[in-house]
């Protein structure tokens, strides 16, 4: 079998950098250890909100949405403390721009607006939930320097909770309190249908989900074991953006016919917001920085180096893609043969590979970043996508991925179709 090689490397001159050597990422919970007044690892609550969660005040769902207040007209005012570093300003500005370019939420810098967020260097990574009125603080310390963490805290300030606190989380996670300190047990409480509502499916790749070992070894265990290393990802998922849009009732007067589960962009109604791995006005094209591969009825091999030409660690991901196509209605199969130069970690937040094989093109598929997890190597992945995107992410140096791929005659159309239960988009299951 002939292995075709390729290289996707970026010379690092525009990316935000966090240091010259690999630095252990500290999640929101770890950064806030010892900080008073924190619930759920990184959330600050007003006294009224605490009474709601503690059950000392009873409210209807309509009243609850008033407790977790939205920003009027989806416009958020903010300012930076003088000590807020230039790197953090760039990172936070990038996070706000990402949200505003894919939703109807807009951000405006102002230190005199009646309601505003104050960004401060100190106190770990934490935020209040929703708009509290007046000035509220968003803490963004030195352990927060990753793009998805910036978005994570902003999403709290927009009124969104953690994925692992959803009232239906027990369908997707097993929660162990064995190694959780007694004073931390409250961080693992679920919300109720009376305090929150779910607008999207449970998303293992959400930037609002903590990792497997956040509160202690094996505290949050995925009931789908394929997702164990995906939990804690800080890339920002498509469904994270959908969550914001639903929260703020974003939309356009006229909807486009977006493909592959995309939606009309409330920030620019002439184009669609596309799931990761898809691009173009209507989400029917490959993203830039994509290598296109054509599957045959026999196994073909391919390897690719992707990432940076330097070992500096960045605060955001360099994304590159493979796009595997086959004749219409054929089923594509992929095998990951080797992962070289990957950093094994929960959340795969240094580098990772995602084969988008599931029927719902919007959901995050399991990420792979651990060469020692040999049970996932040389295993046939049967895709319900044609073309099948493979997403490669990198924050530190470069990595090498080797795959085999082919198509088989099993018609995709022989699969049943369903929805995610939250909207009407149909896909193969």
Curated annotation (Swiss-Prot):
Q: Where is the active site?
A: 153
Could you tell me which cysteines form disulfide bridges? 104-250, 125-144, 252-272, 274-283
Q: Carries keyword Disulfide bond?
A: yes
Q: Which UniProt keywords apply?
A: Disulfide bond, EGF-like domain, Glycoprotein, Hydrolase, Metal-binding, Metalloprotease, Protease, Secreted, Signal, Zinc, Zymogen
Q: Write down how the cofactor binds this protein.
A: Binds 1 zinc ion per subunit.
Where, subcellularly, is it found? Secreted
Q: GO molecular function, one example?
A: metalloendopeptidase activity
Where would you say this protein principally sits, based on its record? Answer: secreted
UniProt: Zn(2+) binding residues: 152, 156, 162
Q: Which GO terms describe its cellular component?
A: extracellular region
Where's the EGF-like domain?
245-284
The yes or no answer to whether the keyword Flavoprotein is present is no
Q: What is its EC number?
A: 3.4.24.-
Q: Check the record and name the InterPro entries matching this protein.
A: Astacin-like_dom, MetalloPept_cat_dom_sf, Metallopeptidase_nem, Peptidase_M12A, Peptidase_Metallo
Which Pfam families does the record match to this protein?
Answer: Astacin (PF01400)
Q: Name the cofactor(s) required for activity, per the record.
A: Zn(2+)
Q: Which residues are glycosylated?
A: 54
**EC category:** hydrolase
Say what the protein does. Metalloprotease.
For this entry, the protein name equals Zinc metalloproteinase nas-17
The scientific name of the source species is Caenorhabditis elegans
